[in-house]
């Protein structure tokens, strides 16, 4: 697969030998999710030092939430295949509903959030990493919905802490975790080989929001902007049946399809993912924040032609 000559023409980074990196992984789906485990294994096999600091359980759509002033507990994965995987929990007050303590206030063990997991990782699990990768998320994080994304916001925390970060999301129905991991690992290798003039993996203060289309439809790679467009939007509804048949007639927060994109959305990441492109959208820790697009385009374009489209051989 090839990208356009225009994308391949620009570029200022110089190829360098690849080195083993210290990489912190996190997600918003829990430390046992197949995607993060596959990425851990792929990066380790490529020679990198990799550690996981993730929520205990699914924390999708938690955005930038975190619980402050509460005691936390850190656990370690008991699967010997993932000896460097850690998770975070805390407690919350709630009403007991069992017969033995009905109506009483009790402490309920709950998962830490994605932001909390990255903060833990940067402080205790792998201080001063070369790179933070959050994901791969099962479901794309696109456009305006990034503001609610635990994946995106956790990566933003890393960028704000001075660490280059990738927020990685795949198609919701994509089940090929090893292939997703191989593509991300290949991108990491490209970042390492095409460092910036100062030796950094990415321009200072910049992260990348990476979204993958269904892999069987992958057409190429595209440098995009996060933008505002997203094919669906959140709303309150009196009937959640369209989201889950078991919730028919029940009220709650669901989704509705958005109108088609217009000319103003032409370079938005959601538009290009829908066309079958792997998208790389630079961000500086805030959704839609302005960035020097020309400078970033020149710095990142080599990755599109030389890294993300040619998958590593098995």
PLM feature spans:
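Charged helix-capping and loop-helix junction motifs
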Residues: 147-153
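Electrostatically charged, flexible surface regions
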Residues: 181-314
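N-terminal signal peptide c-region/cleavage motif recognized by signal peptidases
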Residues: 10, 15-17
